[in-house]
């Protein structure tokens, strides 16, 4: 089934060119089914790229998905035009009375700042609390995952001596988990972060389980059933050249490992994680669909 996004959202042209089926509101209304309602709280500076990456993965699932773009109410984006934000994003204050099958919380370039010093931390805490009553399942990504674990469980993040950047081999520790269905025993995942959450800091008795990790970069994916949340520290949504773009932005300071052939930044990297991203997001959407109430009003009851 296709994904429904605004007709003039820039991601639409990109996805249609890739063969992803994108549905108009009129076409969606003709289908006598309830679509999955997914909110994307996009904290990334380059919002258009992140919108496209997430929509690509959700649009490949076998369900009709309505993707709604949400922003922090009292934060002004410096890297995405005000026109784009105004046209396509709703502030959280405007949607807080509504209910969603799923919520995706992205990362943000604030990893080196204490949580309480992030300008929108108070609102993000309210959003995390709101997700427990108004959202059926949540997927938190990178800094969003660290922030959620800190908010819900008091787990601190730790700064890294240098940026963890590259494509790393990860171990699937729970192949029978519905989140990991179809993923191989070992699989590649792009990593790009300055901080980490450590296994030894995970509290006992909270039901947290490690689904995947890497010998080189640590924890990758944690299931948090009590909060109905999947915490993903890395980036299966990344495009083939996302890490290359970050390397150029950082002026060549942090060469991504296991990425450029022969460590030559002029060489074209191979995307070895695309299928893994589709599997994980497909599993998340499918499990959300299987367990969410048919009536959105029943979410949180």
Curated annotation (Swiss-Prot):
Major localization listed first in the record, in broad terms: cytoplasm
Top-level division of the source organism's lineage: Bacteria
Presence of keyword Aminoacyl-tRNA synthetase: no
Sites where the protein binds substrate: 163, 192, 249
Site (Important for substrate specificity): 192
GO molecular function, one term: homoserine O-succinyltransferase activity
Catalysed reactions, as listed in the record: L-homoserine + acetyl-CoA = O-acetyl-L-homoserine + CoA
Keyword set, alphabetical order: Acyltransferase, Amino-acid biosynthesis, Cytoplasm, Methionine biosynthesis, Transferase
Active site (record annotation): 142, 235, 237
GO cellular component, one term: cytoplasm
CDD domains, per database record: GATase1_HTS
Biological-process GO terms, alphabetical: L-methionine biosynthetic process from homoserine via O-succinyl-L-homoserine and cystathionine
InterPro entries cross-referenced by the UniProt entry: Class_I_gatase-like (IPR029062), HST_MetA (IPR005697), MetA_family (IPR033752)
Family, as annotated: Belongs to the MetA family.
HAMAP family (UniProt xref): MetA_acyltransf
Name of the protein in its database record: Homoserine O-acetyltransferase
């Amino acid at each position: 089934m296709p994904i429904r996004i605004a007709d003039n959202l820039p991601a639409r042209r990109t996805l249609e060119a890739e063969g992803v089926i994108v549905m108009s509101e009129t076409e969606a209304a003709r289908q006598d089914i309830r679509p999955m309602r997914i909110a994307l709280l996009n904290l990334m500076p380059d919002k258009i790229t992140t919108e496209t990456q997430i929509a690509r993965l959700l649009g490949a699932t076998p369900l009709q998905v309505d993707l709604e773009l949400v922003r922090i109410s009292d934060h002004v984006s410096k890297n995405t035009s005000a026109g784009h934000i105004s046209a396509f994003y709703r502030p959280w204050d405007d949607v807080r009375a509504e209910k969603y099958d799923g919520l995706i919380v992205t990362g943000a370039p604030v990893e080196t700042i204490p949580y309480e010093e992030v300008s929108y931390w108070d609102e993000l805490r309210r959003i995390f609390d709101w997700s427990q009553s108004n959202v059926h399942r949540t997927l938190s990504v990178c800094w969003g995952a660290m922030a959620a674990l800190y908010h819900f469980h008091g787990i601190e993040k730790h700064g890294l001596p240098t940026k963890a950047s590259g494509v790393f081999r990860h171990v699937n520790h729970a192949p029978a988990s519905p989140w990991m269905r179809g993923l191989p025993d070992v699989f590649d995942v792009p990593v790009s972060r300055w901080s980490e959450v450590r296994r030894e800091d995970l509290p006992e008795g909270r039901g947290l389980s490690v689904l995947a990790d890497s010998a080189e970069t640590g924890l990758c994916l944690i299931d948090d059933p009590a909060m109905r949340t999947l915490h993903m520290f890395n980036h299966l949504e990344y495009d083939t050249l996302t890490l290359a773009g970050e390397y150029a932005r950082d002026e060549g300071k942090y060469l991504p490992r296991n990425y450029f052939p022969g460590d030559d930044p002029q060489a074209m990297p191979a995307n070895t994680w695309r299928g893994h991203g589709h599997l994980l997001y497909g599993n998340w959407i499918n499990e959300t669909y299987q367990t969410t109430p048919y009536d959105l009003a029943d979410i949180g009851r």
